[in-house]
């Protein structure tokens, strides 16, 4: 489908820079620039799609990277479609899997979807967000429609997908229904007539299928924008609940603030790029000040306050800062403490205490836990069998013994 060309103005270039900020890939960038130019010239907003399968009930900051990008594009005046994959969740996304993902029940999906959107609304503007469910068009397809859809894509193309190839070569079963997942996600773009689809880097194949299917159905092809996976608080692996290196957006303000203050100075700038709504010019100016001798802690406090304020309130952010500073002022947590690396993650708290030099023996470690004298990241340890996964933790025994423990696998 052809459209009249519109000029690439400085305003379009500025919009394109916002889209590119922090992204991994923007395909095809020249096409997207033309879409932006046409939108500015005609006043017709682009249709920007983000699909999420509600496979878990809670969202952490890693999930918000792509939501932040949606909000930035939403603030440019474009139509944002928050697509809940209630139908595709019953299949299970095979992206990045070494085995078949178990499907969810309708009840699980409905429960998770409510929580997902409520939390996503803390980033997106609900008044300007279109919510859709892909069961709207997938349920009516039926067997005939599903077969017709499947006829538009080849097995050879499907096997270009890295995780399918790896499983096939390794003799790991691939169920036929798993081929349907990227097809149905792609068909979502056809049903919604999407101009741009967003996703994580692990979703690139699925997003490209949508682009190809739109061509098959005679539509203008969507562009795709992939966002990187956020590194967790340990600075090593992607943010994940299973790794214990995550910051949940529904966490208490003080906990959220404290975890953000625990990240390294280097990782802080990556968080600024992917999580902050401050302009790149503002961030560059702040970085120049830090490079010029200003305390990096000031920049970290500003980031922590911004994020806590977004998911709670400015008042909660101020209170979290006050509580954090009080702990240092009262000698609760020193700014400087020994740093210890402990291997063998996941590792038990009793051994961690010994390895960190906070206790002299296992019996002393056990006694301190039983007496409530051990804290990890400020939280009292009540279970002597507690296991900690890989990550960085502030471990405290009594009032005066502290160590920053980096737990590695």
Swiss-Prot record:
GO terms for cellular component: cytosol. One of its GO terms (biological process) is tyrosyl-tRNA aminoacylation. A motif ('KMSKS' region) lies at residues 238-242. It catalyses: tRNA(Tyr) + L-tyrosine + ATP = L-tyrosyl-tRNA(Tyr) + AMP + diphosphate + H(+). Its EC number is 6.1.1.1. A motif ('HIGH' region) lies at residues 54-63. ATP binds at residue 241. Belongs to the class-I aminoacyl-tRNA synthetase family. TyrS type 2 subfamily. Homodimer. Catalyzes the attachment of tyrosine to tRNA(Tyr) in a two-step reaction: tyrosine is first activated by ATP to form Tyr-AMP and then transferred to the acceptor end of tRNA(Tyr). This is Tyrosine--tRNA ligase. It comes from Bordetella pertussis (strain Tohama I / ATCC BAA-589 / NCTC 13251). The gene is tyrS.
């Amino acid at each position: 489908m052809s459209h009249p060309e519109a000029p690439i103005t400085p305003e379009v270039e500025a919009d394109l820079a916002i889209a590119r900020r922090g992204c991994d890939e923007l395909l095809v960038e020249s096409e997207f620039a033309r879409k932006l130019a046409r939108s500015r010239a005609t006043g017709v907003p682009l249709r920007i799609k983000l699909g999420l399968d509600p496979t878990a009930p809670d969202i952490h900051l890693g999930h918000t990277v792509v939501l932040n990008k949606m909000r930035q594009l939403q603030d440019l005046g474009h139509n944002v479609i928050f697509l809940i994959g209630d139908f595709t969740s019953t299949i299970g996304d095979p992206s990045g899997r070494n085995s078949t993902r178990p499907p969810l029940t309708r009840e699980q999906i409905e429960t998770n979807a409510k929580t997902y959107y409520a939390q996503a609304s803390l980033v997106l503007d609900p008044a300007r967000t279109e919510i859709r469910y892909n069961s709207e068009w997938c349920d009516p397809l039926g067997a005939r429609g599903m077969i017709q859809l499947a006829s538009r894509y080849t097995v050879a193309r499907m096997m270009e997908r890295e995780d399918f190839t790896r499983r096939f070569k390794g003799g790991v079963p691939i169920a036929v229904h798993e081929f349907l997942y990227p097809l149905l996600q792609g068909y979502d773009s056809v049903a919604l007539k999407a101009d741009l689809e967003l996703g994580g880097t692990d979703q690139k194949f699925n997003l490209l299928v949508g682009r190809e299917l739109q061509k098959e159905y005679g539509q203008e092809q969507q562009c795709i924008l992939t966002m990187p996976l956020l590194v967790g608080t340990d600075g090593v692996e992607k943010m994940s609940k299973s790794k214990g290196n995550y910051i949940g957006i529904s966490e208490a303000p003080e906990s959220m603030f404290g975890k953000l203050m625990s990240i390294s100075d280097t990782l802080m700038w990556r968080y600024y790029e992917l999580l902050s709504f401050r302009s790149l010019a503002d961030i560059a100016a702040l970085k120049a000040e830090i490079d010029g001798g200003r305390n990096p802690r000031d920049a970290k406090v500003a980031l922590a306050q911004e994020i806590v304020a977004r998911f709670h309130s400015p008042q909660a952010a101020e209170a979290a800062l006050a509580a954090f500073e009080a702990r240092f002022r009262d000698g609760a947590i020193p700014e400087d403490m020994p740093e210890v690396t402990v291997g063998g993650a996941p590792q038990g708290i009793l051994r961690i205490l010994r390895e960190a030099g906070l206790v002299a023996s296992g019996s002393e470690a056990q006694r301190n836990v039983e007496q409530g004298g051990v804290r990890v990241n400020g939280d009292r340890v009540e279970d002597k069998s507690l296991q900690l996964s890989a990550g960085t933790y502030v471990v405290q025994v009594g009032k005066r013994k502290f160590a920053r423990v980096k737990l590695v696998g």
